[in-house]
Amino acid sequence: YYEQLQYVGDTRIQALVSLYMTGDGRLMRNAIEQIDSSRTAEGATYSRAPSRLQQYIPTFSLWWIGMVHDYWLYQQDAGLVASMLPGVRAVLSFFAVRQGSRGSLGRMPWWNFVDWSAQFQGGVPPIENGGFSALLDLQLLMAYQWAADMEANLGSPGLAAEDREQARKLHTAIQALYWDSGRRMYADTPARTEFSQHAQALAVLAHMVEGNAARDIVVRTIEDADLVQATIYFRHYLHSAMNLAGEGDRYLDMLGEWRAQLARGMTTWAESPEPSRSDCHAWGASPNFELFRTVLGIDSARPGFRSVVIRPFLGKLEKVSGAIPHPQGEIAVALERRDGRLHAEVSLPQGVTGQFVWQGQAKALHPGSNTLVF
């Protein structure tokens, strides 16, 4: 059981596992504070904290902003989130001085790790000599979007407007630099010779494409074997894009790697595909919460989990049930296909409302017991 360092990319996923399985946000809060404390004068965080050795992965500073945003969505602790906004601003300033006139990032220092895909050298995706990487630009775009959301609600409306403008500018640059109209996908660099599942997943999550266009790109991303394939870590982001685009019914069919680990007798999840070992690895544990968020469909619809959206994707399952802890109690869901209809029983904590979405239909949920038929 190998991995013990608190790497940011790993920890963001592990924090969601902890919230969905225990509801206890204390470890997540502690991680957010420790990573914030590792920031340099330039604004970047360590790749892992605490650590006696300095190591920097710029993209992990962006995922830290994502962690703060996740905490805001799922925990009722706005004070902690507000206290992290100076750190969020510092991280974005580190990236802002490295953005070119169009908004795209230039050459970045340190280890620009994204995933362990075989075609990525040392985990680093293709980057042109002057910079220009769709994967880095898309992660920065998401960070600006998260920051704008938090600033507008808990911080400075003026800074929220600045973040939105940075996001708009970067959105335009990404579309111009990386969109390949012939292949109808986002390339990894402006040369448009290399394409990855990573770029398409991030484009969907960053709202570069939405609606039917997002669904189309997700389907082709899953089915196109010529794309650089996401490995265990980045499969979480591919699965999240599937869910967002409405293709969550494919999720259970995407778990072959995890089934193979069980067949090999591994007792904890691995970091990467074979050759591997049983790492007890945080990012490999993403199905532990995705089964609740995608299959049962339970997610936060407002900061503090004060409203819930339940949008299940059963795949081939006929019957499924489960429950997750919530800051105000428990959310329980039981679903069954019967006589050509979906029968749903949903229990929400007192004071929590929401919406149940099934195949384009939406029905309101109220506190307590809800019985629905679609």
Where in the sequence are the language-model features?
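Boundary/linker segments of alpha-helical solenoid repeat arrays
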Residues: G43-A44, Q229-T231, L262-W269
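Active-site acid/base region of carbohydrate-active enzymes
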Residues: Y1-Y46, L73-L138, E151-Q200, F305, ...
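Alpha-helical repeat scaffolds
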Residues: A213-I222, L252-L255
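Well-ordered alpha-helical scaffold segments within catalytic/enzyme domains
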Residues: I13-D24, W64-L80, Q139-P157, A201-G211, ...
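Short, solvent-exposed loop/turn segments at the edges of secondary structure
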Residues: G9, T59-L62, G66, W111, ...
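Aromatic- and carboxylate-enriched substrate-binding clefts and catalytic-loop regions
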Residues: N129, S196-A199, T231-Y233, M242-A245
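Non-catalytic C-terminal accessory modules of carbohydrate-active enzymes
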Residues: N153, R164-E165, T172, D249-F374
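Solenoid-like repeat scaffolds
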Residues: P190-A191, R220-Q229, E257-A263
